Amino acid sequence: MTELVTKKLVIQEEQVRGPWHEAWSSFKKSKSALVGSGIVAFFVLIAIIGPFIVPQGINEQNLTLRLQPPSAEFWFGTDDLGRDVLSRIVHGASISLTVGLSAVLISAIVGSFLGIIAGYYGRIVDTIISRIFDIMLAFPSILLAIAVVSILGPSLQNALIAIAIVNIPSFGRLIRSRVLSIKEEEYIHAARAIGMKNKRILWKHILPNSMTPVIVQGTLSIATAIIEAAALGFLGLGAEAPQPEWGKMLADARMFLLNAPWAMIFPGIAIMLTVIGFNLMGDGLRDAFDPKMKN
């Protein structure tokens, strides 16, 4: 009798635990995902509280201390204008994370909207939107971003817009394929049969069941967006002086690589660690939400 009650309780517990709970349990078991989450959390914390605790001002120049190696006073050394590299990296974290998160949020919203419309309504709407995505994906993302910034003009804001635009097709095609699968489910046909309007079907059934791949793709896309922002900054098409954006810091320090490698190495390490963190976290989310893709 006791064994039957125990089995019944186990079955009831499994029924209560939804897919989000299962995904979270799987995510916590992944060491690489936890490491990635820890790295991301560290840089987010640095971006929030770092500017209040750094020892030097980001634009505080002292030419008598230019190109100083790492020391007790300047942990990461100084750049060609005598500015503290550590302080600028800390302030740059908020810039890079803001650009990455904002660009991905914009591209996810726009791309998801277009993907849902294309996948659900099909026909000429699907053809037009899909062809636009194909044309955009025919170009390397960084090349397309450079073209957009060249039209809008070099600035951090325009770089953010360019990065958002070039990432729209990846979200759009992902959601479109998801919607094509979902709209053939029986509960969608049942909703149509009882007279439910398309807008309600999209909002109540299609959209909630399409969010899982968006979350995974969004996490991975943040890493790509940070790299693209750094690349645009390095090329002089993103952040402008004296903004301490990591890519801009690399560009300013490249002329002094042999004499002061620390001015270029430390911003590069910051970019690398942030990208690795988001990639590991994204891989963990993908494995948690879709265990079939783990191998």
Predicted region positions:
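Gly/Trp-centered helix-boundary motif
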Residues: 1-112, 116, 123-124, 138, ...
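Transmembrane alpha-helix boundary and packing residues in multipass membrane permease domains
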Residues: 43, 116, 145-150, 159, ...
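Generic hydrophobic transmembrane alpha-helix motif, especially the helices
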Residues: 75, 85, 109-111, 116-182, ...
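Glycine-rich helix-loop "coupling/hinge" segments at transmembrane-helix boundaries
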Residues: 148-151, 163, 178-179, 228-270
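Helix-loop-helix units of permease transmembrane domains in multi-pass membrane transporters
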Residues: 187-194, 202
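Conserved ATP-binding N-box helix of the HATPase_c
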Residues: 210-213, 277
